[in-house]
């Protein structure tokens, strides 16, 4: 059984990155093959940010971004990049775990996020869905 973990770990947010890390480690301890689904609504720029988000803060937060990217690279098993819902049909696991950071966020900026983070992309697949 292979499990895909879906959350917003690509945001440079401590809670989201640690949630992905903790769920992945727990599944590892249970002997369950898993990886974090690296879904984003649009391709990240060279700094690991969604283009045009917080431009004024980018210069002052480069070290923070670098540290998040290093942590993800060294401590998370990530799938290949899936960018936008046009690639969502390619995502295939036996089970999906949805992180609480995606369930409880009050903001949905893109329809792509709702499509992904409410399991719309896999509703017709026989996989188990856990949130």
Language-model-detected regions and their locations in the chain:
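Aromatic- and Gly/Pro-rich donor/ligand-binding loops
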Residues: 5-14, 18-131
């Amino acid at each position: 059984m292979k499990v895909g973990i879906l959350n917003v770990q690509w945001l440079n947010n401590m809670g989201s990155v640690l949630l992905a890390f903790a769920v992945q480690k727990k599944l590892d301890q249970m002997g369950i093959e898993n990886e974090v689904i690296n879904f984003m609504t649009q391709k990240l720029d060279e700094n690991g940010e969604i283009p045009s988000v917080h431009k004024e803060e980018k210069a002052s937060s480069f070290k923070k971004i670098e540290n998040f990217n290093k942590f993800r690279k060294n401590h998370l098993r990530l799938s290949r990049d899936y960018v936008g819902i046009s690639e969502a049909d390619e995502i295939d696991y036996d089970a999906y775990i949805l992180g609480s950071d995606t369930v409880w966020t009050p903001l949905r900026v893109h329809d792509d996020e709702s499509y992904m983070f409410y399991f719309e992309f896999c509703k017709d697949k026989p996989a188990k869905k856990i949130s």
